A protein has these predicted regions:
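Nucleotide 5′-phosphate-binding alpha/beta core
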Residues: 1-107, 113-257, 264-268
Length: 270
């Protein structure tokens, strides 16, 4: 059944049809160059309004902040200073730094204190920033590449892993990419590989092996992920397929979306 689906997708250029769904985002992003300040002010006011009745917003009078100059009365905080608030949120408290209950926390790598930091990821943040940003990236790519066959195959989306957050129901902590994969629109799962179970494996060596087996015979047209992680996967796929040319594995591959890190080393490798 999977082979039949792949053949159908490959034969028909569904990208031209699907691209029309991205037109509104293309028009919206076109305004960034000419209305950047007004758009930023609109977002600023919305953030102040949405956080006004949180503990933090009440403490610093977010309700009365309409201009950036007034925001300057809110002191700049280090992570260590807001960590107690974050910990309370991780234990399920509502309306602390953001309205309602935040269920997901992105775990950063150790930095200055060589300790991980836990960044609250709200539902609004997921949809209005992360998913919207992904949509915009695809929209701009399709706009600049009208002959693309992006949707004639599938996207290899590489992410990290997550784990339960304390014992709070439905709350997760882990790599941001894993949180995005966990909550992605089910329709996206129809055009991405590997499946969620493999994508969220915590053992990286096992993940690389299973991703290789699950994707090397698929028609992959696009890649998304951290360059260093993607490099490990692609190297293993090339090794298993017995080639040094990625085009022999996925002849229709056309674009790589980098989540973070330097793409240069990956581009030289593949």
């Amino acid at each position: 059944m999977q082979d039949i689906t792949n053949r159908i997708l490959r034969q028909m250029n569904s990208t031209r049809l699907i691209s029309t769904l991205f037109k509104p985002r293309q028009k919206a992003t076109a305004l960034y160059a000419t209305q950047a300040e007004a758009l930023q002010h609109k977002v600023f006011c919305r953030l102040m309004k949405d956080a006004a009745h949180t503990e933090w917003g009440l403490k610093y009078g977010y309700k009365d902040i309409k201009r950036y100059q007034r925001l300057q009365r809110v002191p700049i905080q280090t992570y260590e200073e807001i960590k107690p608030y974050v910990e309370r949120m991780r234990h399920g408290e509502k309306d602390v730094l953001w309205r309602g209950e935040v269920q997901w926390f992105a775990k950063s790598s150790g930095t200055t204190n060589d300790k991980s930091k836990f960044i609250p990821v709200s539902r609004e943040g997921l949809h209005d920033i992360h998913y919207a940003g992904g949509m915009d990236a695809v929209a701009l790519y399709l706009q600049q590449n009208p002959e693309s066959r992006f949707f004639s195959g599938k996207g290899l989306i590489l992410g990290g892993s997550h784990a339960p957050n304390y014992n709070v129901k439905r709350s997760l902590v882990g790599d941001l990419s894993a949180i995005l994969i966990e909550n992605v629109n089910p329709l996206v799962n129809l055009i991405r590989v590997p499946d969620k179970k493999i994508a969220l494996l915590s053992d990286f060596e096992e993940k690389v092996e299973r991703i290789t087996r699950a994707t090397m015979n698929q028609n992959v047209t696009n890649l998304s992920g951290v360059p260093s992680w993607m490099m490990a996967v692609l190297k293993h796929i090339l090794e298993v397929k017995g080639t040094d040319n990625l085009a022999e594995v996925w002849p229709d591959l056309e674009v790589f979306f980098s989540w973070r890190g330097c793409f240069y080393s990956l581009s030289r490798t593949i």
